[in-house]
Amino acid sequence: MPFEKRKVSADNLAVRSWALAHQAGVFTYPHQDADGEATYAIVVSGVKLWTLYFSCDPTQSRDQLLQHFNNLCDPDANVHPQLTAETVCLYPGDLLIQPPGQFHSVYTPTAAFTIGGHFYSYECFHLTEIARYFDVTLKGELTNQVHHHSLETLMQMIVGLPHLDRERKLKKNTLLALCLMVIHPKRYRLKVHDTIRSTQVSAYCQTIATDIVNSMGGPEFDPQHPYFGKRSYVDAGEDVDWILLISNWLKC
């Protein structure tokens, strides 16, 4: 649904499903998918060699991780001692689900047709947040696309928290990351993104997100906070009582 009678970005629909047709011999260089979205892909015909890249030490600082992945995306750099790689061979009917910020390259040895799409998930916003941080820090050089629906979707997912199944588990780092992206949207905005406008709805979402962050003890972008400290960036954190955290808003 649109916020305050504004038009919904076409990206809200376009990213949900897409189709790609490639001739044989096409190679897509290493990159991460834009705006920290997860990806699914299904091969309809042909073959895809999908190579996934991982940090040898996921507890490194953000700047160190960024440097390694930035080197990976340099076509002239051939050796990457800080990274490991795994190649998945996808045949017709195979489904690949890729987490946010997963650096990957794709080689198409035969003519191929693939369908897929992008999505956000409450289970992996800790990966979405750092992927969007990488995007902004290097001004979009690590990705091959720009989406304009991200902030609107993230705000909707904040508003949607009270409507989740009460039995659902949410993790601390994941919930913190979602809230931080809503509270500080300009920190994750590329210049080519649509202008961020302050509205009653965005203020409402930011108030909810701020209450959640404060209830969990920060971090308000304090670099000394454990969220930004020496931890594995793929660690979603421990379970949190998210129903208690939003209890004030359940009454509204």
For the regions a language model picked out, list residue spans one by one:
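Eukaryotic intrinsically disordered, low-complexity regulatory regions
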Residues: 151-214, 221
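Active-site region of the double-stranded beta-helix
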Residues: 1-92, 102-168, 211-252
